């Protein structure tokens, strides 16, 4: 478990994972990317926290016996990020929707959620097709410190 603390507030949040890899402040909260810290069989956890630091949605990107290294992380304003994980030549995007969507059944492998059937999601995870260009990309720091709690 990873415990993060907002720099300006006393609020703390516990997340699955061990390493806070990237953090972005977006219009309606924060987007956090957390890994286990093991590149040989890695999982990427993507969290959307609202401005009061409540976890509104989370998703796991992982595949059994498959290495994963997070790279090429960039922000596409206002509420989207692009990154590489399993292979540097392929890209993924994670967008925070303006309002949650209801879904029946889960996402396609290797995207995993805690709720396998009917659920409400704020995060939309997609594999980006080749040839799609990044436009207006820049990094926005978010105010979190983290520590591992044993």
For the regions a protein language model found, what residue spans apply to each?
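Short beta-strand elements that form the blades of beta-propeller/WD-repeat-like
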Residues: 28-40, 72-87, 127-136
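Short, well-structured hydrophobic secondary-structure segments
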Residues: 6-54
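Charged low-complexity stretches with an acidic bias
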Residues: 42-71, 75
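C-terminal charged interaction modules
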Residues: 82-85, 91, 102-141
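Repeated scaffold domains used in trafficking and secretory/extracellular systems
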Residues: 15-29, 63-76, 109-130, 145-149
């Amino acid at each position: 478990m990873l415990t993060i603390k907002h720099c300006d507030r006393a609020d703390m949040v516990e997340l699955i994972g061990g390493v806070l890899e990237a953090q972005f402040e977006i219009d309606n909260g924060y987007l956090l990317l957390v890994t286990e810290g093991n590149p040989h069989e890695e999982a990427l956890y993507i969290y959307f926290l609202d401005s009061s630091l409540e976890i509104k949605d989370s998703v796991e990107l992982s595949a059994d016996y498959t290495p994963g290294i997070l790279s090429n992380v960039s922000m596409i304003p206002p509420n989207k990020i692009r990154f590489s994980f399993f292979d540097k030549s392929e890209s993924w995007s994670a967008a925070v929707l303006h309002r949650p969507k209801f879904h029946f059944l889960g996402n396609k492998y290797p995207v995993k959620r805690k709720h396998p059937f009917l659920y409400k999601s704020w995060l939309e995870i997609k594999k980006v097709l080749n040839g799609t260009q990044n436009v207006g990309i820049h990094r926005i720091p978010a105010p979190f410190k983290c520590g591992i709690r044993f």
